[in-house]
Every structure is written in structure tokens, then in C-alpha cells.
Amino acid sequence: PPGSLMRDKLLAWDASWFVRLAEGGYPKSYEYGPTGELLGSTLAFFPGYPLLIKAVAAVTRTDHATTAIALAWIFGAAVALLLCALATRLWNRRIALALVALVCVQPMSVVFTMAYSEPMFLALVLASLLAVQRNRWVLAGLFGFAAGLTRPTGAALSLALIVAAVLYVRRPENGPRRWWALAWAFIACLGVPVYLAWVGARLGEPNAWFRVQSAGWGTTFDYGAMVWKFIRDALRAGDGWVQLSGAAFFLLLYAI
């Protein structure tokens, strides 16, 4: 709203959930509304980012909200540096700088300045992929595992690491120790299921995380259906810059 501090804007929406989680931890049961309806809770949010907020705040003796914003800015800068390094290795520095610019100006890059988990997650993803390019499979696996504990989309990184490891193993010139690549790629795959299993054990249902997520935010795995619905609706009836530019960005990525 008008008159609110910029700090409040950087701590809006999901950011407030992360700060709350860093301060109070996870609940031990489902949370319900006054009429008995299931509510969303901090259990919907993966632990990587809030745990780091809590640890850094304890060491630096700063409040959790300030720590959350500072970490997001640091990881946002790391995203730019790591993307530049990875793209330079894959193509050249000119393309790398263009990619960094594209990422930084796309509509939702605003989350790189907010207390969101996206900056940390993307930095871990890029670090893992860069480690793969350098055949540093231990680091790739560790960064991949950490990414899986940061956001559920870590599952997509896990798939990429498995494919890369299989291709690496198929080349005999990489030596007998090349099979370790598969082992570390598998370790990277554990981040997401470990947290989902922990939530299930805590609440007594294997699908507990999905229930909390659906109750609080109405989101489920739909194999990309909502993305295409967003693009279609934005192009047909959207009149806002975020909606239209977001749809155009998705279409540009698809074309590339």
C-alpha cells in the first residue's frame, strides 16, 4: 500500500513465511481454520533458506528479516556471476553477458531483491551445473542436494544431473572412477524426497506436504498446465505489464 516502507515490500508474500519459519520453526501437526478447514502452513516451504537465515542471524546477531534480505541480495549477485561463468564456458563471454542481462530484466527478477528462496536456489543450481562442466561431481552432488532442500523444483536439477552423469559414464576415456558421477548425481536426487518424507513422517501421512501446499496455495503438480493457461489468459485478456511481459518471456524461451 502507499506509504509502506521498501523493507516491508521486500518482506511481503512468501518472504514473511520464510522469516516466520526461521523464527519459530515448523508446526508439529496440521493447522486448521475456525470452521475446521485445512490451512496452509510453513511446512509448505522447504528448509534450506530459512535454516540458513536462522544460522546467519545467530552468528551475526541481526534480526531474521534483515538477514533474509541480505542473503537474498548476496545470492542474487552470485546468480549473475555463476551464470556468466557457466555460459562463458559453454559459449563465449558475449553470450554470457547477454544471458545475465536477460535474466536480470525479466519480469520476475524482482524476487532476487526480496527475501525469497529463488536467489539461493538458482545460485545452487548454477553452481551444480558449473561443477558438472568441470567434472567436479562431488560438488555437483552436494550443491544439487542443497538445491533439493531449498525448493521442490530441485527435482528438475536432479534429472539434469542424472542425464549428465549417464553421458559421462558412457565415455570410457573418463576412467574407472567415472562411475562415482552416478553416485553423486543420485545423492543430489535425495534432497526433495528427503524433505517430503520428513513432512509425511511428522504429520503421519505420506502425502502431507501436498495436502498443505494445496490447502494454502491451491497448487498441485499439473505437468505445466497452469503455465500455458497463464500465457493464454495473459495474451487474451491481460492488461498489466507483469502479465503481458511474463507471457512474452515464456514464449521467447520456448522459441529459443
Regions found by a protein language model. Name each.
Residues 74, 90-91, 105, 109, ...:
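Transmembrane helix irregularities
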Residues 104, 125-130, 138-165, 187-190:
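Membrane-interface alpha helices of multi-pass inner-membrane proteins
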Residues 114-120:
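Short acidic/glycine- and proline-prone juxtamembrane loop motifs at membrane-interface regions
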Residues 12-61, 223-231:
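Short hydrophobic/aromatic helix or loop-helix immediately within or flanking a transmembrane segment
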Residues 54-55, 67-90, 255-256:
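Transmembrane-helix motifs of polytopic, lipid-linked glycan transferases
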Residues 63-67, 83-105:
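Transmembrane-helix signature of polytopic, membrane-embedded enzymes
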Residues 1, 10, 158-171, 175-256:
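Membrane-lumen/periplasm interface segments of specific transmembrane helices
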